[in-house]
Amino acid sequence: MKPVNAKIVEIVEESPTIRTFRFDISFDDALPGQFVMVWVRGVDEVPMGSSYLNGITVQNVGDATSKLFDMKVGDSVGLRGPFGKGFTLPKKDEHILIIAGGVGAAPLGPLADYAAECGAKVTTILGSRECYELVFEDRFSSAGELHITTDDGSAGTCGFVTTVLADMDVSVYDRICVCGPEIMMANVMKALQEKDALDRSEFSMHRYFKCAIGVCGACCMDPDGLRVCKDGPVLNGSLLIDSELGDHKRNSSSQRVRV
């Protein structure tokens, strides 16, 4: 699949390090949790979870995202996708728990929107290091019940998403959907295992993608060889309990490095 030229039509500053970029094209068939490959010309092509049908929400963490942050309305990138498996779509009257950390809120925003529109009940735990790094607070609040956590206590509960999760009866949720920093997700996975809820959980994984179609193996997870771009990026929690999640990942040279 060749990249399609996409012109930036709007830039929203979500936090000092996170921005949403909207484009003049829309992936109307994209499902919550799927991703697109963003070609930042002259730098790199990187995977980004769709936060809107015509938008991505990005944290400035590397060369490609730094170049993207230098762009203005009217500049363009190349987009191809959508790729991968997204979250299981909720049904009317189901109750889903969303657990989002930092920019991990990006692929969960569309899920919250869809759930609210179809008549499902939504509860969200939204975490960040500080209050100004909270992403899509109003969006999740509009979808249903919202619990906020910050590492420094500047908003909501002082602590981590697992601080709130520890006191929850997760048996009331039909599905638990998670995305955030890997260490956060590993801790959530352990908490859900203790609550016997892993089989009802789905995690949106982050790995280094090259081909995005499951051929090159750059995004494979040990020990089962799960291809995150093809088998995921959304994977059932029961598949991850004995995986490298929270311990190792592969770098751009496909070498195993510690998270």
Swiss-Prot record:
Pathway: Pyrimidine metabolism; UMP biosynthesis via de novo pathway; orotate from (S)-dihydroorotate (NAD(+) route): step 1/1. Keywords: 2Fe-2S, Electron transport, FAD, Flavoprotein, Iron, Iron-sulfur, Metal-binding, Pyrimidine biosynthesis, Transport. The keyword RNA-binding does not apply. Signal peptide: none annotated. Residues 1-89 form the FAD-binding FR-type domain. GO terms for molecular function: 2 iron, 2 sulfur cluster binding; electron transfer activity; flavin adenine dinucleotide binding; metal ion binding; oxidoreductase activity. Binds 1 [2Fe-2S] cluster per subunit. [2Fe-2S] cluster binds at C211, C216, C219, C229. Its cofactor is [2Fe-2S] cluster; FAD. It comes from the Archaea. One of its GO terms (biological process) is 'de novo' UMP biosynthetic process. Heterotetramer of 2 PyrK and 2 PyrD type B subunits. Belongs to the PyrK family. Responsible for channeling the electrons from the oxidation of dihydroorotate from the FMN redox center in the PyrD type B subunit to the ultimate electron acceptor NAD(+). This is Probable dihydroorotate dehydrogenase B (NAD(+)), electron transfer subunit. It comes from Methanococcoides burtonii (strain DSM 6242 / NBRC 107633 / OCM 468 / ACE-M). The lineage of its organism: Archaea, Methanobacteriati, Methanobacteriota, Stenosarchaea group, Methanomicrobia. The gene is pyrK.
